[in-house]
Every structure is written in C-alpha cells, then in structure tokens.
Curated annotation (Swiss-Prot):
Biased composition (Low complexity): 1-22
Name assigned to this protein: SWI/SNF-related matrix-associated actin-dependent regulator of chromatin subfamily E member 1-related
Cross-link (Glycyl lysine isopeptide (Lys-Gly) (interchain with G-Cter in SUMO2)) at residue(s): 31
GO MF term set: DNA binding; four-way junction DNA binding
UniProt-annotated stretches for the region Disordered: 1-71
Family matches, as InterPro entries: ChromReg_NeuronalGeneExpr (IPR051965), HMG_box_dom (IPR009071), HMG_box_dom_sf (IPR036910)
Keywords associated with the record: Cell cycle, Chromatin regulator, Chromosome, Coiled coil, DNA-binding, Isopeptide bond, Nucleus, Phosphoprotein, Transcription, Transcription regulation, Ubl conjugation
Classification via SMART domains: HMG (SM00398)
Complex and partners: Component of a BHC histone deacetylase complex that contains HDAC1, HDAC2, HMG20B/BRAF35, KDM1A, RCOR1/CoREST and PHF21A/BHC80. The BHC complex may also contain ZMYM2, ZNF217, ZMYM3, GSE1 and GTF2I. Interacts with the BRCA2 tumor suppressor protein. Interacts with DTNB.
Amino acid composition bias (Basic residues), ranges on this chain: 53-65
C-alpha cells in the first residue's frame, strides 16, 4: 500500500498507550491511505490511455426503481424504431444492428412531419397513461412496501460499510464484504444470457414465420391478380355481348316495323286482316297458312310476298 502524507496527529502520537486522539488519528490515516491508493491506481491508466466514453455495460440491466410499477413509456422515435426494425431486418438479414439503426435514423430525419407527428402523438398518449398508472401505483400498498424495502436495503448497505471499516481497523480481511460485493452477479449473468438466447431464438422463429407468411401472401396476390384479370376480361366480353344484343334488338325492331308497313296493303285472303307491330307474328302465320292451302290460286300473292321480303332484306339485313 502506498503511503501518502499523514495528519500531524498521526505522525506525532506516542506509540505507548492508547489515547482518544491516537485512535481518531489512526482512523483518518487509514482512510487517507485507502483514498490515495485508489487515486494512484486510477491515475496511472488515465495517463497511459485517454478515458473513453462508455455506455451502459453490455449484458447488464439497469436497476428498476419501481420493480412492480407500471412500465415506462418510450419516445416517438423509439416507437418508430421498434415498428420498422424487424421490417428492415427481414429485407436485409445480413445487415448489422448499428447499420440498421443508422438507416432508421436517416429514415426518421426524412420522415414527413405528419407521419412523424403520428408517432409523437402515440408516445404522448402512452406517457399520459403511464403518469396516471404511476400515480395510482404510488397510492397503493405495493408502492409503500417497495419503498420500505428499498430503504431497508440502503440501511443494510450503510451497515455493511460500517462493518467493513471496523474490520479494517481490527486488522481482518473483509470476507463478508467481498462476498456481498459479488452478490448474485454470476446468477444474474447466466439468467440474462439464457433469457437473451431464448429471445434471439424466438426472434429467429418469428422471422422465419414472417418470411413464410410473406411468401404465401405473394402467392395469394398472384392468384388475386390472375382472378382480377380474368374478371376484367369477362366483364369486357359481357359488355361486348350486351352491345351486340342491343344492336340485334334494334335491327329486329327495324325489320318488324318494315314488314308491318310493307304488308299493311296486303290483307290475308278470306279475312282481310292486316298486320300491326303487336300482331305481326300472328298475321304472318295466317298468311302462310292461306298460301299453303291453295298455292295455285294465290300465285300473284306469292309473288307480292317475295317482292316485299326481298326489299326488306336488302334494306335492313
């Protein structure tokens, strides 16, 4: 242990009997030696290598202030990252995590204000809900128990620090303190790694499912496009047939009108009946029956009918 400057009381105290001043000076000397030793140990590496800014240690969770309290909300930017990260990872599975974050940061900066405001509004809504739940939790019995437990742990730590100082003054190693300083670290690390592995496995499984669903979706989209094309083709054919039907109906109406007008001067023999648009079919049947009964007698009528039919056919067919 390196020795720094001691207090005058500690340097000039007699070595014989124990006096109150001697005990206090010894405590101060021990504290200074510990403080200066730690400073000397910290100073050396800093002179050799500049201190780098480091984030929260990897694999170590931040301590939750309220273990049973409501989950803290995330910002609008974090909501955007959580929503888009898996989509980018699916499209670019080989892209490292920092590159994905960098890509999403650039995408966020170029995002339209209206779209960006949507995430900010959702984050603000979640924040207000969190404040309500936090206030309700602070009024609950669980919060009181939690704060009491935190206070008890704080007192235990202070007692442990006092016990460490007493042990040093008595010349013993701080076995209990060393055991407390490494408390639960291996267990925590193993549990964290197991949880992280399980989470990564679940993410891989979900990504595979997502890829399978996207492939099925692509197949269904192709079928849908094919069905849509077939439906459009059938609709076009139906429209064409409807136009043809309408044209034929108009042509038929024109032929019936021409026949009615042409046969108006040609009554049925024996009855004197002439056709109208409503009775044209009945008239033609009666005329055909009269001619078949005695063709020789109605030769002039037959010639007249042929002449009318030829003229109507040339004009309307």
């Amino acid at each position: 242990m390196s020795h720094g400057p001691r207090q005058p009381g500690a340097a000039t105290a007699p070595a014989g009997g124990k006096t109150p001043g001697q005990h206090g000076a010894f405590v101060v000397a021990v504290k200074q030696e510990r403080s200066e030793g730690s400073r000397a140990g910290e100073k050396g590496p800093q002179e050799e290598e500049p201190v780098k800014k480091r984030g929260w240690p990897k694999g170590k969770k931040r301590k939750k202030i309220l273990p049973n309290g409501p989950k803290a909300p995330v910002t609008g930017y974090v909501r955007f990252l959580n929503e888009r990260r898996e989509q980018i990872r699916t499209r670019h599975p080989d892209l490292p995590f920092p590159e994905i974050t960098k890509m999403l940061g650039a995408e966020w900066s170029k995002l339209q204000p209206a779209e960006k405001q949507r995430y900010l509004d959702e984050a603000e809504k979640e924040k207000q809900q969190y404040l309500k739940e936090l206030w309700a939790y602070q009024q609950s019995e669980a919060y009181k128990v939690c704060t009491e437990k935190i206070q008890e742990n704080k007192i235990k730590k202070e007692d442990s620090s006092s016990g460490l100082m007493n042990t040093l003054l008595n010349g013993h190693k701080g076995v209990d303190c060393d055991g407390f300083s490494t408390f639960d670290v291996p267990i925590f690390t193993e549990e964290f790694l197991d949880q992280n592995k399980a989470r990564e496995a679940e993410l891989r499984r979900l990504r595979k499912m997502n890829v399978a669903f996207e492939e099925q979706n692509a197949v269904l989209q192709r079928h849908t496009q094919s069905m849509s094309s077939a439906r459009e083709r059938l609709e076009q054919e139906l429209a064409l047939e409807e136009r043809r039907t309408l044209a034929l109906q108009q042509q038929l109406q024109a032929v019936r009108q021409a026949l009615t007008a042409s046969f108006a001067s040609l009554p049925v023999p024996g009855t004197g009946e002439t056709p109208t648009l409503g009775t044209l079919d009945f008239y033609m049947a009666r005329l055909h029956g009269a001619i078949e009964r005695d063709p020789a007698q109605h030769e002039r009528l037959i010639a007249r009918v042929k002449e009318i039919l030829a003229r109507v056919a040339s004009e309307h067919l």
